[in-house]
A protein has these predicted regions:
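Extended, charge-rich alpha-helical interface modules
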Residues: 1-78
């Protein structure tokens, strides 16, 4: 695999993860403020655990980016 392919995939994955974390946080804030139009079946604790896992994974990707000297600014170009 070429480094460029690896880098592109890593940046895409990171960008998508950041977007999903943001959307989950918005969802949880709406839930906490009673602004949802439905009642989620899974417990709030499960969603909190999911957010925690996603943030941990984001830190792993950031570590890989730093190790491979991939600039966070490059995420904007993906």
């Amino acid at each position: 695999m070429k480094m460029n392919d690896y880098k592109t995939r890593l940046l895409s994955e990171y960008k998508e993860l950041v977007d999903r974390i943001s959307k989950l946080r918005v969802f949880l804030n709406k839930w906490d403020n009673g602004q949802l139009s439905f009642v989620p079946k899974p417990s709030r604790a499960i969603y909190s655990k999911q957010l925690e896992a996603m943030c941990t994974y984001k830190m792993c990707l950031e570590s890989r980016m730093l190790t491979d000297k991939i600039s966070f600014k490059e995420v904007e170009n993906v």
